Amino acid sequence: MRRIFRWRLDRHKKSGKPIVFIDESGFAHDMPRTHGYALKGKRCYGIHDWGAKGRTNAIGALVGKAFLTVALFSANINTDIFTQWVKQDLLPKLPPGCVIVMDNATFHKGKDMKKDIKNANHILKYLPPYSPDLNPIEKKWAQAKTVRKKHKNIELDTLFKITKL
């Protein structure tokens, strides 16, 4: 399945169609500690609830090696939010005849979203199951999280505006 997917994607690239990779990622508002201290042989326990401050979810589209668009949401991503993002943010920014690639998340399968993509004359392709390694945007999310760890006070919208991710 993976080989067939790569072969088909390569055919689209050779025909000159832009390939757009889409994915979402969550960013914690407060970065958890990675180290702690305890007596030798004892487990290290923390009393701070690191998840209590919430998280921001990002949806992005990657063309080549750069983000075409990134949108931030305080809510969990669902079919309605994703469909509206595709319609209002992604599609107006795409060049004609793109191949849009995304994973098989449930909210990526909305009928309205599929129809919007088809009506805009783009091709929708889903990654093979359990194949995040075939989606280069995953590496961009990892880069963004690394930069954020180094610069803890940077806001997410600023992070995506000023960095060359």
Question: Residues of each region from the PLM?
Answer:
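Short functional hotspots at interaction and active-site rims
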Residues: 1-165
